[in-house]
Amino acid sequence: MSRPIFKVHKGDRITFQQRLQDGYVCLDQFIPLLTNLSSFNFHRDDPLVENLDDMVTSQFNILIDTDRSGTRWITLQKAHELWDLLQIKDDSGSENLTDHDDDNEANHNGVEDDGQKTPENNGRKTDNHTMENGGTENTNNGNNSSNKNDGNVTAEGSNFRPATITNGTTSRISGGEPDTVKHELLDLPDSPTKRHQTKSVSKIPVFQHDLPTVSTLQKTLPPVSNYSNDERAKLETLLQRILFPETTNLNVAEGYPSVSLTQQVQELDTQFPNVPLNFNIPIDEHGNTSLHWLCSIANLDLLKQLIVFGSDRRIGDKSGESVLVKSVKSVNNYDSGTFEILLDYLYPCIVMVDDMDRTVLHHIVITSGMPGCNAAAKYYLDILMGWIVKKQSRTKESHCVLLEDIDLQWVITHLLNARDSNGDTCLNIAARLGNVAIVEALLDYGADPNIANNSGLCPVDFGAGTQPRFQSNTKNLMATPTKTHETSLDPMAESTSLITNIKSLLSKISNDYGDEIKQHNGKMKELLDTLNIKREALANARDRLAKAKQIQDEYNLLSDRLNNVENTIAEEDQNFQLASRELGLSLDDVQEEGLNSADIAFDADEPFRISYVYTKFEEKIKDEYNNDFELFLKHCNLSQLVHEIYDNFPSRAEIPHPKILKARIKAYNRNELHLDSTLQTIIPHPKILKARIKAYNRNELHLDSTLQTIKDKQKNLESKFRKVLSLCLKIDEEKVDSMLDGLLQAISNEDPEDIDTDEVNNFLESAAE
């Protein structure tokens, strides 16, 4: 959103566009005029000149801010310089919304007479979110009255403005009329500073309970950790009552409920007797205290009361961020215009740094890089520097050493060029973010663009401070030990210095890169060695795994074979029992014959075995050949062994005559007598012999039947094969048998792929004929 500014140049009326959000002026109307004024002898439409605009802006040292639509904008300060250079005057016949006509500006944008925008028609969308707490919607922009002196604040009857740097010197404000300066904090016609001017109290309140002992940069105090649950419960109950009271009475000045903290504390003392009220207890997981939250939401009324009740302003959160840092990380104080009054109560936090050694200026610059926070950050920066200047006329009766020490000289010496843990100054961060307005403001306030961070990068490397008006500062700023650098206005000297700086920077980067490459190569070598070792170990592990899998497979195979053998043995035993029953060797038959089950131990060779001879053979193999039957067959003389056994056979007198033996067997069968011991050792029991004979007969019948079945199957199969061949060869079945030998010879070969098909075909053709 922009508004017109009407100007007159050589009798012609020119309309310039000014952006409402930050007061920047569109550059497009300046380019033709500056081209005519420049030293370039080219026509604007000359095809040889493609970058004429860049050449013009470079000649006149113009920093450009390009928005998303491609429109180029410059600061209002630079626009005034160009208007003066081009001798462009205001159009007296129109209403210009410039810094010389604030009343018309207010009427044009829906601003009330007191300088504040009405909530119904405020002319802009407020981005009221915080960086940490998510933010809340705020419909009140505050109604603190503002002066109508074009941003000049009256102090002791005289107008004064914040100190700025002009032509290398510092204009210090000490109560008198200031020198003419180019960068003014409160003179932008539509700046947040003018929209949100607030009335500061004439005297800065001083609370001695938490003032820093020295006026040098120091760390914030860590969050309180030694507290009881009752203390925390009491504080949370109090915050619930004061932030969300049951009554609906609002503080008209700030838009928050008006609550008496003293009354609430008295009521809580009756509810929590003997429990002290500690306002410094953290109330969230980030270590934020009540002051942190109140600063973030811009609730000044409760903030003042908490400080009166003894809240410590030096305590930071878990990151070391002070309550003042929380206030600049939110846009609520910008929307309500309460930041200047807030500084009257939080000035001890100006000397505080967080765990990364970052000051409040660092955080203001970082906030400027957040979406929708650029204008708020610029407002915080201008108000802070303006407060530093104006407080010099307000601290005469305060009798506070800290307030007396914190002046503009102290800010430039200790705060403006302070470096964080990375070596970055606030100007270095702003230059990297590319925030032109913040960079120019910091340079005007006296920031040094040549201070390098830990990586060797300076703000100058990002284009900050390269304009001649910043390079002409060759003296110490305000007689302080702040480091300055002489810069010649000679373009050749400037180019030589810039080339030297670039060479040194490239050399340092090259050295750092070489060191990093060496370290990287060393680490890579170590990693490769480790990788090779791991690869060998992996290969060995894979080999072991393969062997283990092979052994496991073999084990599984052997287990399967063993199971198969056992199953086969069990099956054969079962079949043997069935066959034994069929052959008359079952246990039932033995029991019918009056024998025990041990008597039916089956031995197929037993009917053909002579126990005496068999015993002699066993003794011979065992005693002389150590049970090695192959060795026995190789070295033993069987004929000699047979003669020995025959010679040593028991005497024939011990064996009865065959007739006598038959008579005894008959008598034995009639149970008339028992066989003597000699016959019992030679001839089995007659019943066993009968059972065996019966079994052999049955077995022979079974074998004959099986043989006949096989023969029948074979004949049937041969008949089928003969029929198949006859059909294939197209001959009679009777001729197949006579042709089998020739056909077999034709197709027989070791390799089936090398079968001589021609020979087979010839044979088949001859057979068909």
UniProtKB/Swiss-Prot annotation:
Residues 164-173 have a biased composition (Polar residues). Keywords: Activator, ANK repeat, DNA-binding, Repeat, Transcription, Transcription regulation. Residues 110-130 have a biased composition (Basic and acidic residues). Residues 132-152 have a biased composition (Low complexity). GO terms for biological process: positive regulation of transcription by RNA polymerase II. It holds the Pfam family Ank. One of its GO terms (molecular function) is DNA binding. It comes from the Eukaryota. The keyword Plastid does not apply. The keyword Repressor does not apply. ANK repeats lie at residues 286-315, 422-451. MBF contains SWI6 and MBP1; SBF contains SWI6 and SWI4. This is Regulatory protein SWI6.
